[in-house]
């Protein structure tokens, strides 16, 4: 179907989230919370002591949506549309695993995930004025056993470097994911069933 008019702001630079919104026919305008000059609105993405992976990802997604409202208000002269934000993290034995800092960190993460199942948690939030609605998607991913050579070659592609858990389910990593239980789109970064529910709550049509 044709993409609808731009009814929401998307507070995310993720091309995967933009692609998924287009997939369900939702037009949107991109909000950049922090530009190339490192100017913008800060969001604390550091896990807090005692914070569960679910609480962490929900807190960060809400903070992104709230920051997006501020950016949108400044940019649009006070005329604001609903802001959609999301955040994804990996939980391995309830330990939060985010994006790798560098190739060495990506190696460590993939070695930890190798041959084991882990949980991918994505929170999606829509904020408008004083209203905030949230949904959380949890999926289980089983990773095949990865030898050091495969990990090294995969990291050399650059694909893991901006991904939670150091892999992209829709990319080359699909070759070593043996089983998924849950939301494929949620693992990509935007659970579409939950997103459609949120959009409907704000009377925004999709699909």
Model-identified regions with their sequence ranges:
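N-terminal polybasic phosphate/anion-binding patch
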Residues: 1-82, 95, 196, 200-207
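GST superfamily/GST-like fold recognition
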Residues: 1-26, 116, 138-207
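Short, active-site-adjacent cap segments at secondary-structure transitions
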Residues: 17, 89-92, 97, 127, ...
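Residue-level signal for inorganic ion chemistry
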Residues: 21, 61, 87, 106, ...
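Mobile beta-alpha loop/short-helix "lid" or hinge segments that flank ligand
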Residues: 27-40, 123-131, 162-174
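Acidic/polar active-site rim loop that often engages polyanionic ligands
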Residues: 40-46, 92, 130-137
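Active-site-adjacent loop/tail segments of enzyme domains
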Residues: 88-118, 143
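Anionic-ligand binding region
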Residues: 107-113, 123-134, 138-139
């Amino acid at each position: 179907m044709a993409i609808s008019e731009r009814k929401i702001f998307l507070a995310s630079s993720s091309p995967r989230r933009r692609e998924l919104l287009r997939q369900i026919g939702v037009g949107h305008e991109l909000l950049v919370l922090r530009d190339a000059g490192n100017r913008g609105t800060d969001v604390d993405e550091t896990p807090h002591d005692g914070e569960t992976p679910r609480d962490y990802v929900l807190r960060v997604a809400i903070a992104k949506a709230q920051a997006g409202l501020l950016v949108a208000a400044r940019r649009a002269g006070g005329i604001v549309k609903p802001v959609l934000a999301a955040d994804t993290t990996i939980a391995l034995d309830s330990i939060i695993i985010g994006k790798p800092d560098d190739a060495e960190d990506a190696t460590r993460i993939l070695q930890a995930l190798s041959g084991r199942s882990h949980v991918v948690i994505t929170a999606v939030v829509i904020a408008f004025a004083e209203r905030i609605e949230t949904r959380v998607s949890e999926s289980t991913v089983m990773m095949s056993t990865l030898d050091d050579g495969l990990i090294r070659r995969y990291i050399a592609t650059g694909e893991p470097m901006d991904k939670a858990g150091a892999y992209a389910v829709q990319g080359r990593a699909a070759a070593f994911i043996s089983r998924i239980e849950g939301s494929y789109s949620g693992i990509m970064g935007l659970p579409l069933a939950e997103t459609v529910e949120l959009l409907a709550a704000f009377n925004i049509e999709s699909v």
